[in-house]
């Protein structure tokens, strides 16, 4: 991996940065990498905004009123800044997808902001911050010509160890699907895939920092493609086989996937790789073919159901989660009933569900037949009740089983530890074990969103 250009920037001594992160796992990853870049310049992370010399708000633009939430935060930061003295000034920056979408508008509405940086430009954060410290207002939302990942410093080993034994690793960014409800193609750009070399190098850095479980990230992660050292074209399944060979790694996951890109090699990886956890987040959004077409999802409900069956045949113990949108423009009662029917057929271990909210710049925002808010609320309530019932059923179905659990942290009470089940849901155990070990745990009980277990008899 090439060394970061940020190393040419003079170090900044004894400064503290606080990053507030909204949104998806990739935003969490991006915030961590921003911290790495700033750490290389002498910044240390603080969990207290009042202690910070620099506050960054890393934003998400997926849901309704994302910009308003940002401006509300910025109003509070403005008051915090006014209380500062000249001996401890406060710099304020906005990053992420709202930064990309709003750009100069953020400075117009909130002049207290010093810099606005889009998700493809945060590798330049140290140099942009230096310019802002000299009094220049920064808006950098272009798409970088250079590969940003080649210009990020290596992971800060101590910071990785502090975060825990599970880590995210971005392998793919952007989306070319252009679903009519989604802003991702406009805020994250076209699909790009990181090289096998980059990914392997970063995975090794994480493993050397005691990470045991890596989740590969992408807006359309199973759209990843690359080349092996001998020039063969690889898809995500091939990459998983490759990473599974790394010494010290105990678990692999990936998210988020599009049904159209679930190819045979990826399904085979679920069948053949024990290191690949039996959990898959596979959004569908609706069970109505008419609505799926209006959303430009590029598949029908039966295609999704057939895919679920094929994956379950390959890995019978797999748990599925999904995404659902109710109240998309033109959705009728019959369309909604088709979604309910699909959920009943699949049986999810967990899921995310939302009311449709028009996103500026998307085709969905211009569609007629917008659904009444009360209807959306009623449908969402019914859908979430069904999904919650399925989650409870899934949790209870595991009682009495013994499964391997990755121990992640100490529990709330003395003598208690918390681990991660293969199905992603947490497990609370009254025992002691080193963080990072994988233990055989018998599930003895379940709450609404976690398991309770005990160390299995050997």
UniProtKB/Swiss-Prot annotation:
Record text on cofactor binding: Binds 2 [4Fe-4S] clusters. One cluster is coordinated with 3 cysteines and an exchangeable S-adenosyl-L-methionine.
Start and end residues of each Radical SAM core domain: 161-393
GO cellular component: cytosol
Cysteine pairs bridged by disulfides in the record: none
Reactions catalysed according to its record: N(6)-dimethylallyladenosine(37) in tRNA + (sulfur carrier)-SH + AH2 + 2 S-adenosyl-L-methionine = 2-methylsulfanyl-N(6)-dimethylallyladenosine(37) in tRNA + (sulfur carrier)-H + 5'-deoxyadenosine + L-methionine + A + S-adenosyl-L-homocysteine + 2 H(+)
GO MF annotation terms: 4 iron, 4 sulfur cluster binding; metal ion binding; N6-isopentenyladenosine methylthiotransferase activity
Record-linked InterPro entries: Elp3/MiaA/NifB-like_rSAM, Methylthiotransferase, Methylthiotransferase_CS, Methylthiotransferase_N, Methylthiotransferase_N_sf, MiaB_methiolase, rSAM, rSAM_horseshoe
Known EC number: 2.8.4.3
Record's subunit section: Monomer.
Function: Catalyzes the methylthiolation of N6-(dimethylallyl)adenosine (i(6)A), leading to the formation of 2-methylthio-N6-(dimethylallyl)adenosine (ms(2)i(6)A) at position 37 in tRNAs that read codons beginning with uridine.
Family as reported in the entry's similarity comment: Belongs to the methylthiotransferase family. MiaB subfamily.
Name the record gives this protein: tRNA-2-methylthio-N(6)-dimethylallyladenosine synthase
UniProt source species: Bartonella bacilliformis (strain ATCC 35685 / KC583 / Herrer 020/F12,63)
């Amino acid at each position: 991996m090439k060394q970061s250009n940020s190393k040419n920037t003079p170090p900044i001594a004894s400064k503290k940065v606080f990053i507030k992160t909204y949104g998806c796992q990739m935003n969490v990853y991006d915030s961590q990498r921003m911290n790495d870049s700033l750490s290389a310049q002498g910044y240390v992370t603080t969990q207290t905004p009042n202690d910070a010399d620099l506050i960054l708000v890393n934003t998400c633009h997926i849901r309704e009123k994302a910009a308003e939430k940002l401006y509300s935060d910025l109003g509070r930061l403005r008051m915090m800044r006014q209380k500062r003295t000249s001996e401890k000034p406060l710099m304020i920056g906005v990053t992420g997808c709202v930064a990309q979408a709003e750009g100069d508008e953020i400075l117009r509405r909130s002049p207290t902001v010093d810099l606005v940086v889009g998700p493809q430009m945060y590798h330049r954060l140290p140099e942009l911050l230096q310019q802002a410290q000299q009094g220049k207002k920064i808006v950098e939302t272009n798409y970088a010509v250079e590969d940003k990942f080649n210009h990020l410093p290596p992971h800060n080993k101590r910071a990785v160890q502090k975060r825990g034994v599970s880590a995210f690793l971005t392998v793919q960014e952007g989306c070319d699907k252009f679903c009519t409800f989604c802003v991702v193609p406009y805020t994250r750009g076209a699909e790009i895939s990181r090289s096998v070399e980059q990914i392997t190098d970063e995975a090794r850095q994480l493993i050397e920092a005691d990470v045991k479980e890596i989740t590969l990230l992408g807006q359309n992660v199973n759209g990843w493609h690359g080349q092996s050292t001998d020039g063969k074209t690889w898809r995500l399944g091939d990459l998983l086989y490759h990473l599974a060979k790394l010494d010290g790694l105990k678990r692999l996951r990936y998210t988020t996937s599009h049904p159209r890109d679930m190819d045979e090699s990826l399904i085979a990886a679920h069948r053949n790789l024990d290191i690949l956890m039996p959990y898959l987040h596979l959004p569908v959004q609706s069970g109505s073919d008419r609505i799926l077409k209006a959303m430009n999802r590029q598949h029908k409900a039966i295609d999704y159901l057939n895919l679920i069956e094929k994956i379950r045949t390959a890995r019978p113990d797999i748990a599925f989660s999904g995404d659902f949108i109710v109240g998309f423009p033109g959705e009728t009662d019959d369309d909604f009933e088709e979604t309910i029917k699909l959920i009943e057929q699949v049986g999810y271990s967990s899921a995310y569900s939302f009311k449709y909210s028009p996103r500026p710049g998307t085709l969905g925002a211009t569609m007629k037949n917008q659904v009444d808010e009360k209807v959306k609320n009623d449908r969402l309530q019914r859908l979430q009740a069904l999904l919650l019932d399925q989650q409870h059923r899934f949790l209870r179905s595991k009682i009495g089983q013994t499964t391997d659990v990755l121990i992640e942290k100490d529990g709330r009470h003395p003598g208690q530890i918390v681990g991660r089940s293969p199905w992603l849901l947490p497990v609370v155990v009254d025992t002691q074990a080193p963080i990072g070990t994988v233990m055989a745990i018998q599930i003895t009980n379940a709450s609404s969103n976690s398991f309770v277990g005990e160390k299995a008899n050997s």
